[in-house]
Every structure is written in structure tokens, then in C-alpha cells.
């Protein structure tokens, strides 16, 4: 990946999403001309008031998260070995299966790329008449991990028109199976059925 190809001075990315690293890790790609905003506590040359000239020391202050770095390295190795396109195809397949199944459920609104071209392994949805946190809790009781709310992305929710309600988000990965997606859809159907009975 070349920054020049992206016409960007910096590219930042989380390590715990598609790279399968631990939470709290990430990557910051920057050109050689990048300079620190503040100086002090260099980590590798603590007696100096200024950061070292050589990269990466110039941009690395303090104590490094070595366990996180080691975990991220293993995630990168896994992705490299498994193949980015192979992982992406599987995630899209599972996401498409979840999208099609959710779209058949009454009162469920799915937020997805209608063309399917830009859809990634992340899918958000809402349930009419149910708070998204309530749906998330019901799924958690059934051993299904989702994220409910604004997902640290209020601007995306403003664009989607879900800033007030939030959404429920699923993120199928290379470690999930079609059977697990089918289980998720069955449990969603049951949650909706139970909610309908309560509201009658």
C-alpha cells in the first residue's frame, strides 16, 4: 500500500476489525516527512528533549503495547496467509445471507448497499417498535454477539437517518459459518414473535 496512491498524508486504521488484531491496536501510515506535534518522553532516548530523527523512533513515544503489537502481527499473518479476497468473499456471502433473511422479517429495516458492490462484512438493521439495545440484549441472552447503538459513528448514523435510534450491527467474519447466520435469523424471528405477543 502506497500513501502516494491514496493521495493522503496519513492513513489510520483499527487493528481489531479486518486485521484480526486485539482491541486497542491500530496502524498509522505516514510519510517520512511527518514530524511530531509535541516533544518529550521519547521512550528510546529519554535524556533528549527532542525526538530521534530516525523512523520509527521519531513517532514512537512512551512504552509500547508489545502484547497488542504481537497480537496484531499474528492477525496480519493470518490475513496474509488466508488471503484478503478469500476472507472478503466469505464475509460478503454471510452478510448477504443475513441481509436476505432479515429483509423477510416483518418490521425489520436493513441498511445495506442496494447494489451489493460496496457491501462489506458489516450489516446494520432496526426493528420497528423495539429499542436497538433491547434487541441486542435479547440476542446476547441467546449467545449472539452484536453491537447496538451508534457504534462510535454518529455522522454515519446522521447520514442514515438513525441518529436518534441507533441500529443493531452484525459483523460476520471468516470464523463464522452459514449455520451460525441461520441460527441468528431463527433467533431474530423468535425475538420478533415474543415481542408481538407482549404488545397484544
Language model features by range: what are they?
Residues 1-200:
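Pyridoxal 5′-phosphate
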Amino acid at each position: 500500500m502506497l500513501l502516494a496512491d491514496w493521495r493522503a498524508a496519513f492513513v489510520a486504521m483499527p487493528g481489531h476489525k479486518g486485521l484480526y488484531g486485539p482491541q486497542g491496536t491500530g496502524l498509522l501510515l505516514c510519510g517520512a516527512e511527518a514530524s511530531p506535534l509535541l516533544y518529550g518522553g521519547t521512550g528510546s532516548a529519554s535524556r533528549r528533549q527532542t525526538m530521534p530523527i530516525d523512523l520509527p523512533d521519531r513517532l514512537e513515544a512512551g512504552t509500547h503495547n508489545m502484547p497488542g503489537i504481537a497480537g496484531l502481527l499474528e492477525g496480519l499473518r493470518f490475513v496474509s496467509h488466508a488471503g484478503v479476497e478469500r476472507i472478503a468473499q466469505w464475509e460478503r456471502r454471510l452478510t448477504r445471507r443475513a441481509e436476505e433473511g432479515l429483509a423477510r422479517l416483518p418490521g425489520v429495516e436493513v441498511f445495506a448497499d442496494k447494489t451489493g458492490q460496496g457491501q462489506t462484512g458489516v450489516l446494520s438493521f432496526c426493528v420497528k417498535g423495539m429499542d436497538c439495545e433491547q434487541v441486542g440484549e435479547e440476542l446476547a441472552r441467546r449467545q449472539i454477539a452484536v453491537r447496538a447503538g451508534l457504534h462510535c459513528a454518529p455522522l454515519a448514523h446522521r447520514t442514515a437517518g438513525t441518529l436518534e435510534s441507533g441500529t443493531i450491527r452484525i459483523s460476520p467474519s471468516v470464523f463464522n459459518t452459514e449455520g451460525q447466520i441461520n441460527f441468528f435469523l431463527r433467533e431474530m424471528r423468535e425475538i420478533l414473535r415474543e415481542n408481538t405477543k407482549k404488545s397484544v
